[in-house]
């Protein structure tokens, strides 16, 4: 967003250290807990994609070994569009579209179709099938899923669809008191209300729609 994050040579050295670490752990085949900070699993599409997007971005500041890009891209393309070997769909895959902007137009549409067909619910987007977090008679429905979808559709030029998702968010939220999630099939939010993540994305979507 135009912010100058790198202040001096010390900050540049931090980037070099991160690159060395990613190579040392072989990030493309590393077991980690992903965006939801849950069980470790090797090679998550969303995690590999986020790292790849970052590596591409910092190439103008530091040297990124070709192998780090080549290995990551190879595994990413082999896995796409599945999130892991055991999970096809995941809300975290939307991060690859926004804010990472990593995917081609066709890839974006595949991810959007998969999310809307399989994870979309009345009051939000479930993170993945059989998610046990706040699961009461079904997977919890996350408010910010609508915000991500709205922002993405706005960026794709579909203002009507973006507005549709914005109104879905605020339909159950009084005074922008937007929760983390709603219990499955209900208008009942959990106690993490309001959630800064949900609120920030909704404000961003509102800003875009009012430009």
Q: Where are the model-predicted features located?
A:
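Short, surface-exposed loop/turn segments at secondary-structure junctions
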Residues: 5-9, 33-41
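Well-ordered alpha-helical scaffold segments within catalytic/enzyme domains
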Residues: 1-7, 50-63, 95-105, 147-158, ...
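Loop-centered beta-sheet repeat module
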Residues: 39-84
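Alpha-helix N-cap and loop-to-helix initiation/capping positions
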Residues: 10, 43-46, 194-197
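Extended glycan-interaction surfaces of carbohydrate-active proteins
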Residues: 16-36, 67-142, 164-211
């Amino acid at each position: 967003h135009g912010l100058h994050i790198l202040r001096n040579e010390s900050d540049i050295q931090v980037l070099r250290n991160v690159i060395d670490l990613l190579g040392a752990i072989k990030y493309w085949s590393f077991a980690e807990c992903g965006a939801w900070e849950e069980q470790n699993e090797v090679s998550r599409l969303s995690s590999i994609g986020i790292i790849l997007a970052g590596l591409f971005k910092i190439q103008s500041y530091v040297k990124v070994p070709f192998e780090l890009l080549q290995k990551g891209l190879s595994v990413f393309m082999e896995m796409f569009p599945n999130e892991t070997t055991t999970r096809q769909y995941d809300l975290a895959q939307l991060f690859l579209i926004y804010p990472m902007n990593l995917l081609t137009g066709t890839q974006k549409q595949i991810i959007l179709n998969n999310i809307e067909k399989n994870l979309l619910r009345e009051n939000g987007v479930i993170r993945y099938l059989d998610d046990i977090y706040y699961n009461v008679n079904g997977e919890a429905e996350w408010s910010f899923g609508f915000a991500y979808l709205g922002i993405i559709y706005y960026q794709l030029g579909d203002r009507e669809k973006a507005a549709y998702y914005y109104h879905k968010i605020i339909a159950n939220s009084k005074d922008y008191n937007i929760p983390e999630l709603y219990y499955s099939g209900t208008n009942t939010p959990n106690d993490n209300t309001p959630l800064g993540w949900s609120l920030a994305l909704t404000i961003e979507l509102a800003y875009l729609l009012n430009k």
